[in-house]
Amino acid sequence: MTRKNTTTNPWAKFHGPNLGYVIEQYDLYVTGAGSVDPELQELFEIFGAPSFQDDVVTGDNTATHFSPQNTGNIEKILKVVQLVEQIRSFGHTLAHINPMEDAANGQSLLEKAMSELSDADLKAIPAKTVWPDAPEGIHTALDVIHRLKDVYTKSLAYEFSHIQDSEERAWLHQMVESNSLRQPLSNKKRTALLKRLTAVEGFEQFLHKTFVGQKRFSIEGVDMLVPVLDEIVLEGAKNGVEDVMIGMAHRGRLSVLAHVLEKPYSHMFAEFKHAKIEGAVANSGWTGDVKYHLGREQVVSNEEVSTRVTLANNPSHLEFVNPVVEGFARAAQENRKKSGLPDQDTSKSFVILVHGDAAFPGQGIVSETLNLSRLNAYQTGGTIHVIANNAVGFTTDSYDSRSTKYSSDLAKGFDIPIVHVNADDPEACLAAANLAIQYRMLFKKDFLIDLIGYRRYGHNEMDDPAVTQPQVYKKIKNHPTVRAIYADQLQAAGVLNADEVETITQFTQEQLKSDYAQVPPADTSDATIHVKVPDVVAKGIQSIDTGVEIDSLRAINEGLLSWPEGFNVYPKVKKILERRKDALEENGKIEWALAESLAFASILQEGTPIRLTGQDSQRGTFAHRHIVLHDTDTNETYSPLHRLPNINASFSVHNSPLSEAAVVGYEYGYNVFAPETLVMWEAQYGDFSNTAQALFDQYVSAGRAKWGQKSGLVLLLPHGYEGQGPEHSSARPERFLQLAAENNWTVANLTSAAQYFHILRRQASILGTEAVRPLVLMTPKSLLRHPLTLSTASQLSEGRFQPALEQENLGMKPNKVKRLVLSTGKMAIDLAAEIESGKHEYNLDEVHVVRIEQLYPFPAEKVQSIIKRFKNLEEIIWVQEEPRNMGAWHYMAPILFELAGDKVKTGYIGRPDRSSPSGGDPFAHKAEQELIVAHALDVKYNFRQDKQEIEVYSN
């Protein structure tokens, strides 16, 4: 039979779901049961019933000329079309993707649909009618169903129906339904794959037998993770990728280090033996970390290509490495050596994130990070996610760890294609890896592989998993390893014989034994309780001249106040900016936001790129920054910092999503990988920064001590008690001070625009040096425009950052000073305002006030020199606005005690211990604040009075 001329048959162009729709419409047309699309109604009137035909062959596979009009079989065609789509959408429910379970069975929706069609029904329908792209040899609908079941219900299973882009969805189906993904591997590649699996298994078993009881968090059960990573890395390299960033937890990490990142076995064994070995490169800080947290950087290559692979250092806080690694990738993708926004090339780098099956749906940082994937400020052109799925979280079964069928279901909400694959089918795993990298490189979007295996031992090697999962561990005990399974397959296929398989095994064992023999005995000669901090860190940041010539500042300011002709600045914003016009003149005053912009511009002119992000950072939470302008007519944006002259460094400022943890992790990672860049994260209010506490604890404060991982990240945390209640008052400075040690970061609470200008420039000057460290700034809110925080041009052009400032016009009669008051930030300004107001009568000859601008490291020498001036000093008082159990008091108390010596008392004035940072009544707040100020400045005040209102005492 030959095909009719389709130019006279309008139905020939309808296939699959479109065909089903046409048939449904014809049924409505005939029965009059509903409205019919007008265009189709016209076709029905001209051509009659839809008629479909195809070339056929004779025999059992023959599909004769088929027409609903001739057969009256409209319902069967619809059912076939629906069945095809259901196999594509729900084939995963029947797939054998879990090596610990038999192939899925039971009455699913898909099985019900299949039972309603006989083989004869299917044979009668031409293949092209329901699958227009059917490959050669597929003649009938029965062939189609067999073929699609083979694709969608075996050891690879796919979830693509949630993908919203029809082009992507069609590409994915075409890829898996064609033969391109599952082309048989060459015998050479099959043998190489077996060797890789033998190396992975041999390494793990060697550790298990040699270092009995030591934690290693074995990969066994998902051994194919290593070849999957190999495939993704090398396929990426073939596409020109220069950097591959990997983030993963401790499960399987040692094997990934040894095999993917080529860390020598001997170095791994030395870590287990606590031995020193020649050639081992230290990749940790002075306190170090356990071996299964450490990262590595390595150039990986084969005969054709090479690429740099970075495995990020990682704490045991599962999944928190995810945004850090995304930041690595974005930094690697961007060219920051030009003015304006940096140029991003997503083909230069990509991320692989290895997740746990319990952690992926369980940890909120996962969804926070996924939400970054399509955002302009954070997208990295697609991440490949691999869930190393061993179906248990420590001792918790999957039915207790998630509310969804699959651990990967969270990804559906972010439009991410998902492939489930049986970890006991090595070639299927490689097919999944190949699809993942092709999709990522083509569409620049995320892709997820759910690598389903098991965990051969307990959570760590000292656990007995049979205590909590007795049934499954009976199966696992008798279950062959993936290496053994694949070796049997290769022998059955005639690729290798038993002797050749044994030779591969023996070669691996000999290599392991040889490398172990190179490791000397344990070396405890330098074991010591004291861990030495590097000298350059211990010395702290040296005083740096950060002034900028006035003429340069004036030129910058002029540029900051200009915009393209025809650009319509919002009138209110225009007035704010115009007020800055004369700020650098003789009688001008510079407010906080202008000082910041001047600092940014001068830093850029010196060649340092800047990246600033936060939930409202372009405008500023308090409508103060206005660093990105919006045209009132077109909504176009413009930043004056992109057009200033003499700049060869990029500037980017982005509004972030409503997330703290993921964004802080991202910016930290960006800064680690771009150490020459001034990277800043701004909290909307400092109160909300504690949702990123794990990042502060595990990375920002301790990353260098643990891993030697340097960062100069700047945290801008709006802080200050202004009667706005417990959620808009405190950035929790006590927590940052509690973490302060070994000069790990700088914590500051400033009182002037000039101080902010200088500390930003100082921070920029140490980037990329051994002296670098993070900067934690308690930034102002009401003080942004406060008259007492304004600065003059000369204060920016001369000098440097001062860690402590003395209150002007006090301490003029040193011999009369009895009380030295120390405070910081807004509290210091409240004291200054009271002093300058002259409303109350204090004997100010007896009081001196010092503002501690840099809380950590504490400027002890500066303060000590001030104390020495006052021979008759009786007491040193710390005054703060926070409750006594918060703020800086518990950090300051021992410092004051040491400064005071034996003859001078120390004391505290402030709010008493409280469980909440602040009260909610603004009037009560005001009354408390006035009491604190009054008691701080009144030397005659009798300690321990009015304790109900505020806490006042001395030692």
Swiss-Prot record:
It comes from the Bacteria. Transmembrane segments: none annotated. SMART domains: Transket_pyr. The keyword Nuclease does not apply. It catalyses: N(6)-[(R)-lipoyl]-L-lysyl-[protein] + 2-oxoglutarate + H(+) = N(6)-[(R)-S(8)-succinyldihydrolipoyl]-L-lysyl-[protein] + CO2. GO terms for biological process: glycolytic process; tricarboxylic acid cycle. Its cofactor is thiamine diphosphate. The keyword Oxidoreductase applies. Its EC number is 1.2.4.2. Pfam families: E1_dh, OxoGdeHyase_C, Transket_pyr. Gene3D superfamilies: 3.40.50.12470, 3.40.50.970, Multifunctional 2-oxoglutarate metabolism enzyme, C-terminal domain. One of its GO terms (cellular component) is oxoglutarate dehydrogenase complex. Keywords: Glycolysis, Oxidoreductase, Thiamine pyrophosphate. It is an enzyme of class 1 (oxidoreductase). One of its GO terms (molecular function) is oxoglutarate dehydrogenase (succinyl-transferring) activity. Homodimer. Part of the 2-oxoglutarate dehydrogenase (OGDH) complex composed of E1 (2-oxoglutarate dehydrogenase), E2 (dihydrolipoamide succinyltransferase) and E3 (dihydrolipoamide dehydrogenase); the complex contains multiple copies of the three enzymatic components (E1, E2 and E3). Belongs to the alpha-ketoglutarate dehydrogenase family. E1 component of the 2-oxoglutarate dehydrogenase (OGDH) complex which catalyzes the decarboxylation of 2-oxoglutarate, the first step in the conversion of 2-oxoglutarate to succinyl-CoA and CO(2). This is 2-oxoglutarate dehydrogenase E1 component. It comes from Bacillus cereus (strain B4264). The gene is odhA.
